[in-house]
Amino acid sequence: MARQSKKKGRPVSGWIILDKPKGMRSTEAVSQIKYLFHAQKVGHAGTLDPLASGLLPIALGEATKTVPYVMQGTKTYRFHIAWGEERSTDDLEGEITHTSSKRPTREEILALLPQYTGVILQTPPQFSAIKIAGNRAYDLAREGEVVEIPPRQVEIETFKLIEMITKDHSIFEITCGKGTYVRSLARDMGRDLGCYAHIADLRRIAVAPFCENDLITWDELKAVELDKSAKNEKDAPFERNFIKLDELLIETISALECLSHYTLSQTQAQQVMKGNTVLLYHHDVPLDEDEVCVLYQDQLLAIGALEKNQFKPKRLFTI
């Protein structure tokens, strides 16, 4: 019988809400967090373009099981639009493809915003991760191929003009649903206003349920990594302070604010951990609910469904 290989790394769980700097790819950020925490498993909840900065939720260990719930959450972006130029990538990185001397007025911009609020059809940028016949659109675009990307529905809850910095630059803030491309918004608004446009700066400031108050920078992480106080002897080979690093993690359950929470007794918890169904007899428990989570001693135990007051576990968590 073949021996199972031991997983490399520590079984550490929780969320790091990284303030991703410009120039770093989301996958690179995940790799660095995995190395820094010497974690067995790490993933992120929503790609952020290399030229964008801001909130990148990174899940470690058991928290990776909650990534889909964060992916479905609303996102808030603050961004600068540069008027007068359209670019191949719809941001500063691309080549200039169209120019205009026209500049929109504040009144023209405000009159346009309602058209970009609510459920709208949006065509993703040529340089995007959308798959076309099995290939990433950005790979085809880099080869000089112009691909036809079908428009898709996205939802924009709020769209605000924050400031007109100059006649060439305006600052906006949006809260939107999954799959919205801010670069496409700039491109389309520029065309509608007859002046062309692209994104000059983009920062994500929230991914529900996480916000700017949860952010931690690379500098802060590195400072904790090098802190020699309260270091565990087992950490010595890594020259990292895992005790202090682990204190920075946000609890796994924090990603599940969108679900109802119910507390189990010890007997119920034991049954759920075996994959068995248990009856929830709390007075406030609904008869049926598609997804809820259950806890034991304030620790996340499982996600599952309620059917006739019975909890059926679908996903278990190690506590």
Swiss-Prot record:
Active site residues of this protein:
D49 (nucleophile)
Q: State the Pfam families in the record.
A: TruB_C_2 (PF16198), TruB_N (PF01509)
Family indicated by similarity: Belongs to the pseudouridine synthase TruB family. Type 1 subfamily.
Functional note: Responsible for synthesis of pseudouridine from uracil-55 in the psi GC loop of transfer RNAs.
CDD domains, alphabetically? PseudoU_synth_EcTruB
Protein name in the entry:
tRNA pseudouridine synthase B
Q: Which reaction does it catalyse?
A: uridine(55) in tRNA = pseudouridine(55) in tRNA
